[in-house]
């Protein structure tokens, strides 16, 4: 097989070069998989710098696409494992990086494949497809697979992740993420920095794992999702299904929250409420 010189030397800053490569490989960017290419080199560099890769660290990249970020990451890490669901992109990645000793390509859906890989990794990186970003983050938390992560996501989702108590964006997802990670906003990215240009702005976030005191994650997650599904209701009207012992309601700590709505309760307070309810089970 004769490899295409153009495809092997993609100018990631050039829409013309990207278009030509896609045309050559008969690839049409798929919205379903968030196939928008970041064409601003300085932004790419800034995002990678935020990973702060140390010597000997092992990195996972979810959805490398044409390999713009992959190319930079491979210069900084001893081992990069890339998960790519699109077989046509996998072919390009293999051609460009397959002979490098520090590159490993996993073909298929990250959520279905990652458990089969060596879990001894240090950091995870991705420009996450907008439609699955919350699913990926939630799944990693639910599986207690907590690593330092840098993700670029839809700004609307980032606003929920970084939301403060008493704000409209404060949600169950806010509580889920902030209970497990310190969240740092790296930068906002305008639509014109991508090809094809998405209809929404993007934001890059850094998630750093932190310790918490959640006694029963399953019950905590269920509690938070339930009360936020009725966010205009006061807590006393939504936690009734979690109370198996009426003595729970006499807890002085719990009493002060019964007349509050979920957006008025902090992440740490949700943890304490969940632990209190769990103690009476």
Swiss-Prot record:
Keywords: Cytoplasm, Methyltransferase, RNA-binding, rRNA processing, S-adenosyl-L-methionine, Transferase. It is an enzyme of class 2 (transferase). It catalyses: adenosine(1518)/adenosine(1519) in 16S rRNA + 4 S-adenosyl-L-methionine = N(6)-dimethyladenosine(1518)/N(6)-dimethyladenosine(1519) in 16S rRNA + 4 S-adenosyl-L-homocysteine + 4 H(+). S-adenosyl-L-methionine binds at residues 36, 38, 63, 84, 109, 127. It is found in: Cytoplasm. SUPFAM superfamilies: S-adenosyl-L-methionine-dependent methyltransferases. Its main location: cytoplasm. Pfam families: RrnaAD. GO terms for molecular function: 16S rRNA (adenine(1518)-N(6)/adenine(1519)-N(6))-dimethyltransferase activity; RNA binding. It comes from the Bacteria. Its EC number is 2.1.1.182. GO terms for cellular component: cytosol. SMART domains: rADc (SM00650). Specifically dimethylates two adjacent adenosines (A1518 and A1519) in the loop of a conserved hairpin near the 3'-end of 16S rRNA in the 30S particle. May play a critical role in biogenesis of 30S subunits. NCBIfam families: ksgA. Belongs to the class I-like SAM-binding methyltransferase superfamily. rRNA adenine N(6)-methyltransferase family. RsmA subfamily. HAMAP family: 16SrRNA_methyltr_A (MF_00607). This is Ribosomal RNA small subunit methyltransferase A. It comes from Borreliella burgdorferi (strain ATCC 35210 / DSM 4680 / CIP 102532 / B31) (Borrelia burgdorferi). The gene is rsmA.
């Amino acid at each position: 097989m004769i490899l295409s010189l153009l495809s092997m030397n993609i100018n990631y800053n050039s829409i013309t070069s990207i278009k030509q490569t896609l045309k050559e490989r008969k690839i049409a960017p798929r919205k379903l998989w968030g196939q928008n290419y970041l064409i601003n080199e300085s932004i790419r560099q800034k995002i990678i710098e935020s990973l702060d890769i140390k010597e000997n660290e092992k990195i996972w990249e979810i959805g490398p696409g044409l390999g713009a970020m992959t190319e930079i990451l491979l210069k900084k890490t001893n081992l990069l494992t890339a998960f790519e669901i699109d077989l046509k992109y996998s072919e390009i990645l293999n051609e460009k990086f397959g002979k490098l000793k520090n590159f490993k390509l996993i073909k298929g859906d990250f959520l279905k494949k990652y458990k089969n890989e060596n879990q001894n990794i240090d950091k995870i990186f991705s420009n996450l497809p907008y439609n699955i970003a919350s699913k990926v983050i939630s799944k990693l938390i639910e599986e207690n697979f907590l690593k330092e992560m840098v993700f670029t996501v839809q700004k609307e989702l980032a606003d929920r992740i970084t939301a403060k108590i008493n704000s409209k964006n404060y949600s169950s997802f806010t509580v889920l993420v902030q209970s497990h990670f310190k969240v740092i906003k790296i930068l906002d990215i305008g639509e014109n920095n991508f090809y094809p240009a998405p209809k929404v702005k993007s934001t890059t976030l850094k998630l750093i794992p932190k310790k918490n005191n959640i006694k029963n994650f399953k019950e905590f997650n269920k509690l938070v999702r339930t009360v936020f599904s009725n966010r205009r209701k006061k807590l006393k009207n939504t936690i009734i299904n979690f109370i198996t012992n009426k003595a729970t309601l006499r807890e002085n700590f719990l009493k002060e929250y019964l007349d509050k709505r979920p957006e008025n309760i902090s992440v740490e307070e949700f943890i304490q409420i969940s632990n209190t309810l769990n103690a009476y089970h």
